[in-house]
Amino acid sequence: MKFRKGRPKIPRLISEEPQFKLFKPAGTPGTELESEVLTFEELESLRLVDYLNQPHEEAADAMGISRRVFWNILKSARKKVADALINGKMIDIGGGYYKIRECNYEDECQRGRNCRYGVSNCLTLKKDSE
């Protein structure tokens, strides 16, 4: 029997599963390409920091993890994306250990789970209501 050391792993919170889950270089059949698997939480870390320009601390809080764990996820995601772009690999997005974040502000947002910017808006609403 194998025992795991340390704390139990908790699911990372993501805003939603992405609409597009596969990217590949144009003009090459997917069967001829190597692929990199980017987990949903790795994509979420890229979305929060590189797309929404959130500080690491806010992004880590939004995902329900420590800054150190967040940094490791982000570093892994950036390495995989860079490898795929430089070496012409396919990016397959899926898997990981995650949970869809519950939004308690559907009335204010009026978009519910389809909100692409739920993290920053919800964090702002949360701060305003406290």
Swiss-Prot record:
Designated name of the protein: UPF0251 protein MmarC7_1642
InterPro entries membership: UPF0251
Family: Belongs to the UPF0251 family.
Source lineage: Archaea, Methanobacteriati, Methanobacteriota, Methanomada group, Methanococci
